[in-house]
Amino acid sequence: MPVVVVASSKGGAGKSTTAVVLGTELAHKGVPVTMLDCDPNRSLTIWANAGEVPENITALSDVTESSIVKTIKQHDVDGAVVIVDLEGVASRMVSRAISQADLVLIPMRPKALDATIGAQSLQLIAEEEEAIDRKIAHAVVFTMVSPAIRSHEYTGIKASLIENGVEIIEPPLVERTAYSALFQFGGNLHSMKSKQGNMAAAIENAEAFAMAIFKKLTEALR
């Protein structure tokens, strides 16, 4: 079954938040998920250790450059989704993970700098496609987007990406206190006992975000 790689050459773009929200929402829908923490910051591991890991999720840390392909293949089984949270630099590990991907997500905040550095991830995907002689489905996911106002910077970056043929996941992952609280309390949004901001809106956005990615993943596997 599918392998989703979350990659960005820029730290702070929302990689781990994207991975955790996607993984927990898919698991909540009954999809078995294996999450691989390949980021030296160990954000995914911090989330896993903060509370009880939700049902249907296996979280693995200490995945190395030499073990990443083997680990992905070990957990790429029928009916399961593997989500790989990569380090925020271009590296051999990143290249090896991308080569195994059915879908690569490139998170970026709606900022010009994020878009510029995000272009490096798009270039890396193109290079891997050439190396392995197959297309790799990929899409940009906007993170930390204001829930109230879409800035001119955001709409401009989005329009430019679309003009250049880059697919974008809709809806974006909006800025919600509940998403950052996942790394404090662990678990998922549905089990969070300490309510953080507008939980209903956070859950609605997270569900729509995850289902849009799952739809894109299904299309990529056809």
Curated annotation (Swiss-Prot):
Keyword Transferase among record annotations: no
Keywords: Plasmid
Residue ranges the record marks as coiled coil: none
Listed Pfam families: VirC1
Keyword Repressor set for record: no
InterPro entries: DNA_Partitioning_ATPase, P-loop_NTPase, VirC1
Annotated PANTHER family: COBQ_COBB_MIND_PARA NUCLEOTIDE BINDING DOMAIN-CONTAINING PROTEIN, P-LOOP CONTAINING NUCLEOSIDE TRIPHOSPHATE HYDROLASE
Official protein name in the record: Protein ParA
